[in-house]
Amino acid sequence: VYPLSLRETTDTAAWDARLPASPQATVFSSSAFLRATGCRLRLFEVLRGQQVVALLPLTEDDSGQRVLPPPYTPYLGPLCLHEPGLPNRERVLDEFLLGEMLAAELATRYREVRLPLSWQYTDVRPFLWHNYHAAGASRYASSPRYTAVLPLAGLDAETYPARVRACRRQERRKAAALRLHDDIDIDDFLRLYALTFERQDLAVDAGQLACVRRITEAAVGGGWGRLAGCSTPQGLASATLFVRDHARAYYLFGASDPAQRNSGAATRLIFDNVFDALNRGLLEVDFVGVNSPARGDFKLSFDPQLRLYFELHHVAY
């Protein structure tokens, strides 16, 4: 049995080509998305001998001594690449050995590590057991997080609304005459985005807006994102950016005009994005985080299923 090792790669084409084979891979693992965040990016392959068995995308701070999650990135790595048909007992063991190696390697290389895991990466034992028998040694901590995922198998436009909370159905009917469109000006979208946070007494600085712009432009220009809006006679009332990969669509950004919050536009736009994902043949819609009360409740009202994931944190002593 060959030991596991890390090898850095700059071949983004090969990297992206491998992503569909990993259950943990998402659009947030793609080189295009990670470049758009503007972070210092390093891409690693995990080798067993000469075979690539996993991928590990990392983003570092300017010092190169800390691994920090990029902005607007709920999940990252590791990304397992199992052989098709691998028995479950071998898959569990392979993932454990991978986690064990990465826990030790990252703790040695970096002063601090913050790593958000996919909700499909379920075995965090190797990280939690790092230095298990070493009294006083540094340990990994894990923070539970939740997202909400709507399976699209068997879903259709006729029956889905009945599954959604009654108030959302009412808002959809209220907004039935409003105009849905994809010809959104990014400046208009960013204006609404800033207003959405201002209404909650939250500031969005210029750096954050610049990052949202880069991601939005990359997604729309690269064909892996949809910037859509819903307008009233008074103008753009709500806008969303859904990004997508080979399997699912992700509700990444949402923005609404505070003066038109009661128009039902935001709700109608969510329905439209769900049906768009269905028409594209995608498997799921990920609502990307239900980790605050009001926003989480809005997303859960569309009948997705809760999914638990973890963010790992390690600080070297």
Walk through the language-model features, giving the residues of each:
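A conserved beta-strand-loop-helix scaffold within acyl/acetyltransferase catalytic domains
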Residues: 2-65, 119-262
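Residue-level preference for alpha-helix termini and adjacent loops
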Residues: 27, 32-33, 78, 159, ...
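A short, structural micro-pattern
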Residues: 52, 72, 109, 142-144, ...
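Acyl-donor binding region in acyl/amide transferases
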Residues: 64-137, 246-304
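A local structural micro-motif
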Residues: 113-114, 181-183, 205, 285, ...
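Conserved catalytic-core motifs of GNAT/GCN5-like acyltransferases
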Residues: 142-147, 305-317
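Secretory-pathway/luminal and periplasmic proteins that interact with or process carbohydrate-rich
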Residues: 199, 299, 307-309
